[in-house]
Design a protein with these regions (language model features):
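Primarily recognizes the serine-hydrolase "nucleophile elbow" in alpha/beta-hydrolase
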Residues: 108-167
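The serine-hydrolase catalytic nucleophile loop
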Residues: 56-69
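The alpha/beta-hydrolase serine catalytic core
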Residues: 8-14, 21-23, 34, 94, ...
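Glycine-rich "HGGG/HGxG" loop immediately N-terminal to the catalytic nucleophile
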Residues: 62, 84-97
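Short beta-strand element of the alpha/beta-hydrolase
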Residues: 46-55
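A short loop-to-beta-strand scaffold at the N-terminal edge of the catalytic core in hydrolase folds
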Residues: 29-41
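Conserved alpha/beta-hydrolase
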Residues: 69-90
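Alpha/beta-hydrolase active-site loop
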Residues: 94-113
Length: 271
C-alpha cells in the first residue's frame, strides 16, 4: 500500500492544473480505513463533486465503477471509494449498515477540495447507503449531500423474493457463504447480525426532503422488482422525488450504459 497516503486530508482548491487522480486512505468515524480516489473534472474546474457508492462485492477499481467515474468526470469531479470489507479497504462489510460512515468520510473528503456542491449516487447496496446517509446527515454541514441518486436500490431489508437475493442472503448469513464471499467474491463479511436493525431505505426517504432525490431502476432487474423503486418514490411524497424506470436495464452499475450514466451525471451536476 505504499502508493497511498494515509492520514488527515487537507483542504484544497482544485483546478484544471491538477488533472491527475489522487488516491488516499480515509478514516471513518468508527476507525475503519477506506481507500478512495479523487478525479478532477476532465472539462476543467467544476463546482460539483460526485461521490460514487458501489454495490455489494464492488470496489473502487472494478471496471463498472471506473466506467461510471469516467463518464461522471466529464461533468464534475468524482470521488470513488471501496466500502469496508471490499477492495483495499479495511474492516468487514455490514451490508449497508455502518457503510453510511464510509460514505460520510468520502463526502467530507470531497468537500475538502473546495467544491460548492457535493452529491451522491449509489448502486444497489450503495443505493440504500446514499438514501440512509442523506436522511441521517442533513444537519451535518461537512458530511451532507446536496443531491442524491439511488440506482437499483432495495426499498426494504431482508428481501428474499428473487433467486439472486436468496443466494445473497446465503452468502451473508451462513459461515460457508461468508467463506465464498471472501475467497470467491473478494468481500469480507461481518458475521454478526444487525443489532439494532438500521433504518430501512423506505423509512429513510421521507427524511431526505428538501434535498433533491432521484430514484433509478431497470425493468429487468433480477434482484429487486419494480415495486421497490415505486415504494421508495411513494414514500418520498408527491413531488419530492424523480423516478426513472429504465426499459431493458438490469441491475446496478454493471447494467448502467454510458447513455444512462451521462443522464445521471447531468442530473447530479444540476445541468
Amino acid at each position: 500500500m505504499s502508493s497511498v497516503v494515509e492520514g488527515p486530508f487537507r483542504r484544497s482548491i482544485v483546478s484544471s492544473l491538477t488533472p491527475a487522480p489522487l488516491r488516499t486512505m480515509l478514516r471513518t468515524d468508527d476507525g475503519v480505513c477506506i481507500e478512495a480516489v479523487y478525479e478532477p473534472c476532465t472539462a476543467g474546474s467544476a463546482a460539483t463533486a460526485i461521490v460514487v457508492a458501489h454495490g455489494f462485492t464492488g470496489s473502487v477499481d472494478r471496471p463498472a465503477v471506473r466506467r461510471a467515474a469516467q463518464v461522471f468526470a466529464q461533468r464534475a469531479a468524482v470521488v470513488t471509494f471501496s466500502f469496508r470489507g471490499h477492495g483495499g479497504s479495511g474492516g468487514r462489510s455490514t451490508v449497508g449498515d455502518r457503510e453510511v460512515l464510509d460514505l460520510a468520510a468520502a463526502v467530507e473528503w470531497a468537500r475538502s477540495f473546495g467544491h460548492t456542491r457535493v452529491v451522491t449516487v449509489g448502486f444497489s447496496m450503495g443505493g440504500s447507503v446514499v438514501l440512509r446517509h442523506a436522511a441521517m446527515h442533513g444537519g451535518r454541514k461537512e458530511a451532507h449531500t446536496d443531491a442524491v441518486a439511488a440506482v437499483s436500490a432495495p426499498a426494504r431489508w431482508y428481501y428474499r423474493g428473487t433467486a439472486p437475493m436468496r443466494r445473497l442472503h446465503w452468502v451473508v448469513s451462513r459461515p460457508l457463504g461468508r467463506v465464498v464471499g471472501r475467497f470467491g467474491l473478494g468481500t469480507r463479511i461481518h458475521p454478526e447480525e444487525w443489532n439494532p436493525v438500521p433504518l430501512s431505505p423506505v423509512e429513510s426517504v421521507p427524511l431526505i426532503a428538501p434535498t433533491p432525490l432521484l430514484i433509478v431502476h431497470g425493468d429487468r432487474d433480477p434482484y429487486f422488482p419494480l415495486d421497490h423503486p415505486r415504494m421508495l418514490a411513494a414514500a418520498a411524497g408527491e413531488g419530492q422525488a424523480e423516478l426513472w424506470l429504465e426499459p431493458g436495464m438490469g441491475h446496478a452499475e454493471n447494467a448502467a450504459d454510458e447513455v444512462l450514466l451521462g443522464r445521471l451525471a447531468d442530473w447530479l451536476a444540476g445541468e
